[in-house]
A protein has these predicted regions:
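Short, electropositive, low-hydrophobicity segments enriched in small/polar residues
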Residues: 16, 48, 95
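Vicinal oxygen chelate
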Residues: 4-11, 37-41, 56-80, 85-90
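Conserved Rossmann-like nucleotide-cofactor binding loop
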Residues: 45, 99, 133
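N-terminal beta-strand motif that seeds the catalytic metal site of vicinal oxygen chelate
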Residues: 1-19, 24-32, 63-64, 107-144
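Terminal peptide-recognition signature
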Residues: 6, 21, 40, 81, ...
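Conserved short beta-strand elements that form part of the metal-binding/catalytic scaffold
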Residues: 28-59, 102-105
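Conserved, surface-exposed functional patches that form binding/active-site neighborhoods
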Residues: 76-82, 87-92, 96-112
Length: 144
């Protein structure tokens, strides 16, 4: 079986991005690094980060999706990754290097896929008002 590894084209700052990502995720390591590129492993997922220049830009059309078990984890990751970047909607943010992340509590897909469609709609409506996802507010909205 072939291995699929995301290849991310950055406009400089590869070393700074690698330093941020490996500091934010405790289960991460740098596999190799040069001024042009680095390969990192974050929570078992390898990423190649390439210093390709301004020819191409990262876009929210591709993002890294992070499952979070607790609000504390959502809060910590959100704060560290959004610093110098930008908040977006529905759990999305863009870090200071232009990479989009989805910081999503594990309860969110469960609520959105609830067989009680009214409950799922209430959760969806609540999520659509949020930047960073608030688990307690989602659960409260889902309950009605």
């Amino acid at each position: 079986m072939q291995k699929i590894t995301p290849f991310l084209w950055y406009n400089g700052h590869v070393e700074e991005a690698v330093a941020l990502y490996t500091s934010v995720f405790p289960n991460s390591k740098v596999l190799n690094s040069s001024p042009m590129s680095a390969t990192v492993e974050i929570e078992g997922q390898q990423l190649i980060i390439f210093n390709g220049g301004a020819h191409y830009a990262l876009t929210p059309a591709a993002s890294l999706y992070v499952n979070c078990d607790t609000q504390a984890e959502v809060d910590r990751l959100w704060a560290q990754l959004v610093e110098g970047g930008a908040e977006s909607r529905c759990g999305w943010l863009v870090d200071r290097f232009g990479l989009s992340w989805q910081i999503i509590p594990t309860i969110l897909p469960k609520l959105l896929q609830d067989p009680d469609r009214a409950k799922a709609k209430r959760a969806m409506d609540a999520m659509l008002t949020m930047g960073k996802i608030d688990i307690a507010a989602l659960e409260s909205a889902a309950r009605g």
